[in-house]
Amino acid sequence: MSDILQRLSECVEAGKANASSPFPAELKGQPGADELCQQALAAGVSPTDVLERGLVPGMARIGEKFNCGDAFVPEMLLSARAMTAAMKHLRPYFASGEVKRRGVFVCCTVQGDLHDIGKNIVAMVVEGAGFEVVDLGVDCRAEKILEAVEKHPGCAVGLSALLTTTMVNMEHIVREIRARHPQTLILVGGAPVTREFCEKIGANHYSPDPQGAVLYLKSAIAAA
């Protein structure tokens, strides 16, 4: 059992989504995260173990490499896609309640901004850490985010801005959320965003990388 979870974890870290994935070259033709997840479940490994001992460690390792400059956005995307390939087999267990979600994470790129790569990576990594992710897409207005917050009480919100010109919209959205749901956890990120800006607009946390967002969410929930 531990062997298949180790292999699954390694496939996520290496970005090996399935057997037909050409990368990495040394794993060409071998089962990827998709097949190994199915094999683990068929062998009787619990969905919780598949998530916590297979997917999460793999994403954590690639996240650490990203933080240290030993991996870059393309590698993160490949790993996130590998994790997503496995996650599709776990979603029915989340839906049935057999595997409990850590919480709900609502995310989007703010109004006026159509960039989504960073948001998508964060969404996939957070989902892989056991959260339900509600992805509202790009060019998202405050009203749409508020509707999601009201639909998912107690959720955390992640806002992304890749343009300096849309940072003002991020500030407006944070202000609107604070006015109606002051206890909501708000995370912000994106190329022009800084920790100082995060503090200035009243958000809870800034992280330059997906793994930092996951660590903050876990610690915030543990402290609640």
Give residue spans per PLM region:
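Glycine/charge-rich, flexible interdomain linkers and switch-proximal surface loops
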Residues: 94-110
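Cofactor-cradling patches in redox/metallo enzymes
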Residues: 119-129, 134-203, 216
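A charged, well-structured terminal subsegment
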Residues: 216-224
